[in-house]
Regions:
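Active-site donor-binding acidic/aromatic loop of nucleotide-activated sugar
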Residues: 434-438
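Helical hairpin unit composed of two closely spaced alpha helices linked by a short loop
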Residues: 382-403, 408, 413
Length: 525
């Protein structure tokens, strides 16, 4: 036994040393590496197991590169010149304000899609409204439905959508459905088998061939997107999953898009679908119709947006009257539906994946903060900013920019509350204003600055979204949309409490202790 114990100890020491060397030479950020070194030092065996399960950096791994190359090869073979021009043409960049054109270049530096025009946009802040719109659009689908969700809960609303997908598949509509594997691990295979029997093509993300790779990739690299594409003409994206939580408990922001930007959503979906070994048709042209009949209105739908429609007149065509109208709306209802006639939004769809070399969403967010001159309003459920983002927020506030960050008062995950709050002091000392929203859990992932730039998507402001998960964000270059998002943020302030530095310094010792402990591992959350 003594010999066996000695051999085990020697092997463990060599394994620890080897792992430490791998971590040190990893290309990831310093905060993540320090966190892993700390946990391996304190708890060697548990730390090693966790690192090999969820810590290995596969951003530049051969596995992900090969998967992405497969999609690029297929897309290159099957997509015609018109599709390439729609997705990657530079023709519309000149319509973006001059100060923001370098951002459009940054966001497309690794083959992502460019700016598109001819888009209609509907901003949805109500789970009920999103459900109604989606069900109606699914019912009217003629050729295909492409759906990709992080959470697809086994509840009443999800069951109705599932039944609609099966109904359309039986009618001959091609229905492709991707579900994130680990996030929906509690759903039994029979749930999806029923969909398959009805003709729905179902794939899970991801399903590598080898168990060890399966363990690593599924636990740490997740498909966090929420995308729907219907007939290539209507698309949905944003923060809302398929769950009854959005009917009552959660406040989120989502988009319904018509027009050429839908091609960007389609491109992202097909990438994930082919990566998951999904079956696809040879004719790619039908997936990217040149939408001449795009929506001509920008709408903002909030809670129960059925009865009250407000058309802003030409004097208010920039959306300046929205704040005044929302000011009269109870925070519990937000039941206005704003229509902006003859709008033509400039939208750039930005997907990000572990195999992306540069991390577009993180870089784009940092750029947007660094270049803001008047204000920055951010909503995020998880506020664990990497060092570049934290410094950008501090620099902006110290430069006189009105920087406001809204997070939930009570997090949905027990460790995320202390994690969020562990960054408050550094932000407050620099002049960043922090607000905690009470009541409904704020799950929105939005950014708006200087009455022009808006970001709406699936990415949180944390290490995971910026480095590990498959995410998608829409960058919208439009004054009206920016004013809408600003007004929604200001309305949410009515259900929020500002955190002051004085109050923060007086918090109990046990909160300070828990926040400092969680902060050590923030990069791993």
């Amino acid at each position: 036994m003594a010999i066996v114990s000695a051999i085990f100890s020697v092997m463990l020491i060599f394994l620890i040393i080897g792992t430490i060397i791998v971590i040190i030479f990893d290309s990831g950020d310093s905060a993540t590496k320090i966190a892993w070194l700390l946990i391996i030092t304190i708890l060697p065996i548990i730390g090693l197991l966790l690192y090999f399960m969820v810590g290995i950096n596969l951003r530049q791994s051969r596995y992900f590169k090969n998967k992405h190359k497969k999609f690029i090869d297929i897309f290159g073979q099957r997509a015609n010149a018109q599709v390439h021009k729609l997705l990657f043409g530079h023709e519309k960049d000149h319509r973006v304000k001059k100060d923001y054109r370098t951002l459009t270049q940054l966001l497309s530096c690794d083959g992502s899609t460019r700016v598109t025009d001819g888009n209609g946009l509907e901003i949805i802040t109500s789970g009920h409204r999103k459900f109604e719109l989606l069900m109606e659009d699914l019912e009217n689908a003629k050729e295909y439905i492409h759906m990709e969700y992080f959470y697809f809960r086994h509840d009443k609303g999800a069951q109705q959508i599932k039944e609609m997908l099966m109904k359309k598949a039986r009618e001959g509509v091609k229905v492709r459905f991707i579900h994130e594997n680990i996030a929906n691990i509690d759903i039994l295979p029979g749930y999806y088998n029923e969909m398959k029997k009805a003709g729905v093509m179902v794939e899970k993300f991801t399903k590598p061939r080898w168990p060890l790779i399966n363990l690593v990739t599924q636990l740490n690299y997740r498909d966090h997107r929420k995308i729907v594409v219907i007939d290539g003409k209507i698309g949905y994206a944003g923060g809302m999953n398929i769950s009854d939580d959005y009917f009552v408990k959660w406040r989120d922001t989502h988009m319904r898009i018509t027009g050429n930007a839908v091609a960007g959503l389609q491109y992202s979906f097909l990438n994930t679908w082919i990566t998951a070994d999904g079956e696809i048709d040879d004719d790619f042209a039908k997936y990217f119709p040149m939408c001449a009949d795009v929506g001509s209105a920008v709408k903002v739908n909030a809670e129960a947006a059925r009865d009250t429609d407000i058309d802003l007149n030409e004097e208010d065509s920039e959306g300046n009257g929205i704040a005044e109208v929302l000011a009269k709306t109870p925070i519990q209802s937000l039941d206005m539906n704003f229509k902006f006639k003859n709008k033509d939004c400039l939208i750039q769809i930005v997907p990000d994946e572990p195999e992306s070399r540069w991390g577009h969403i993180h870089m784009g967010a940092v750029w947007a903060v660094q270049h803001a001159k008047k204000y920055i309003y951010i909503q995020t459920p998880y506020f664990v900013p990497p060092e570049p983002m934290l410094q950008a927020l501090q620099s902006a506030a110290l430069s006189g920019v009105d920087v406001r960050v809204m997070v939930p008062k009570k997090a949905d995950l027990f460790f995320m509350g202390p994690a969020n709050r562990s960054y408050f002091k550094e932000c407050l000392e620099a002049g960043v204003k922090i607000y905690e929203r009470t009541g409904r859990f704020i799950h929105a992932k939005t950014f708006v600055s200087d009455d022009y730039l808006s970001e709406i998507g699936s990415a949180n402001m944390d290490f995971r979204s910026f480095n590990l998960d498959y995410e998608l964000v829409a960058y919208i270059y439009d004054t009206t949309v920016a004013n809408v998002n600003k007004a929604i943020f200001l309305k949410d302030l009515e259900a929020s409490k500002e955190v002051t530095l004085e109050d923060w310094e007086r918090r109990p010792w046990y909160q300070k202790f828990s926040q400092r402990i969680i902060r050590l591992f923030a990069a791993l959350l």
